[in-house]
């Protein structure tokens, strides 16, 4: 397949692996304290496991997994608020499929649907808007979640709802922003992060220039990378070369998709509809300053929480689960005592096992047999 197969070419993959092996000797890092490269995107995590890229690295280079999966950081209380709204008479609650099985304290949206709530899977926010127009006697709620990748589509949908004066359409906001999260990670003492592989999809919207503070303020090299084996390995090579040269810069491996300035039209739509400020709670990580998203005054009439006023929910994570440590690269999924036994894809305890982009789900899918052996 054009534009895919050439980025999976085995000969070129092995050339990059050989180059990494050769250059790794020049790193100051050892097998006991390897160069720790955090891949922030769940898509990167799955590609790394699927193609076994982490097993090809020299012993003094390691991939660690970051909080780059928005479904994985959904707080239990937010799920419970969604269930409360979805269970009300006359409501059609629309969500992406990944969020259906995320557990809250009072179950999941899938369980709410089984109990009679009208919960529907949609593939875009425009699907939810069409449902609202087709069912004027019902109140239709779209559960908007995701990083900057999905925010432009939500913003454009809300613009359409305003222009068409759709009065029965509402938006439950769980959009969050990536950059404050990276700053929060680096502000933690002993974070152990030496370099970043930044997500291609988010960067397509915000550009590469937005990451400048990571290099200037925290002196960490960062490379925006694509999702195929050659992308990720080339990104690792670029980070290794920066580390050897004692440089901390933002580089763009994914130039075929990501412009340095990002997407100005998407950024303008987001700025029109959303206020990119405020605190937001992240599952396993707590409250992160300035990572929240709210509607601007012109769009506040679509705010589902203001309209339905669900009871405030704040649910503490089970202390047995190590979701927060996995999300910050402090432990591997299989090191959690609940992994594969209490928490597995059939009966997920944490969101990292539910989402198709979760590190625990990736480890279970590609490494569980090896781990059991």
Model-derived features with residue positions:
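Metallocofactor- and cofactor-centric catalytic cores in central/energy metabolism, strongly enriched
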Residues: 1-137, 151, 155, 159-164, ...
């Amino acid at each position: 397949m054009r534009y895919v197969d050439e980025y999976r070419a085995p000969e070129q993959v092995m050339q990059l692996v050989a180059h990494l092996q050769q250059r790794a000797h020049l790193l100051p890092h050892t097998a006991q304290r390897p160069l720790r490269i955090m891949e922030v995107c769940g898509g990167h995590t799955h590609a790394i496991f699927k193609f076994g890229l982490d097993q090809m690295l020299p012993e003094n280079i390691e991939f660690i997994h970051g909080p780059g999966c928005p479904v994985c950081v959904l707080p239990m209380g937010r799920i419970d608020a969604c269930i409360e709204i979805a269970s009300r008479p006359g409501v059609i609650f629309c969500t992406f499929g990944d969020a259906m099985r995320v557990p809250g304290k009072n179950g999941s949206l899938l369980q709410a649907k089984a109990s009679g709530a009208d919960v529907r899977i949609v593939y875009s926010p425009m699907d939810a808007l069409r449902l609202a127009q087709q069912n004027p006697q019902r109140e239709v709620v779209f559960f908007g979640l995701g990083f900057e990748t999905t925010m432009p589509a939500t913003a454009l949908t809300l613009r359409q709802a305003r222009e068409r004066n759709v009065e029965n359409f509402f938006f439950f906001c769980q959009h969050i922003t990536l950059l404050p999260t990276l700053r929060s990670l680096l502000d933690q003492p002993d974070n152990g992060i030496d370099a970043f592989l930044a997500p291609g999809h988010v960067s397509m919207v915000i550009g590469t220039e937005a990451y400048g503070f990571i290099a200037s303020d925290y002196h960490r090299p960062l490379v925006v990378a694509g999702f195929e084996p050659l992308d990720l390995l080339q990104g690792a090579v670029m980070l290794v070369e920066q580390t050897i040269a004692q440089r901390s810069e933002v580089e763009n491996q994914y130039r075929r998709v990501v412009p340095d300035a990002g997407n100005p039209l998407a950024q303008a739509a987001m700025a029109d509809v959303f206020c990119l400020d405020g605190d937001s709670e992240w599952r396993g990580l707590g409250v992160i300053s300035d990572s929240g998203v709210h509607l601007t005054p012109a769009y506040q009439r679509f705010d589902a929480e203001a309209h339905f006023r669900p009871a405030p929910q704040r649910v503490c994570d089970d202390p047995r689960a190590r979701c927060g440590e996995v999300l910050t690269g402090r432990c591997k999924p299989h090191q959690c005592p609940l992994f594969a036994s209490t928490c597995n894809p059939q009966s997920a305890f944490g969101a990292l096992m539910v989402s198709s982009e979760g590190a625990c789900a990736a480890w279970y899918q590609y490494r569980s047999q090896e781990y059991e052996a």
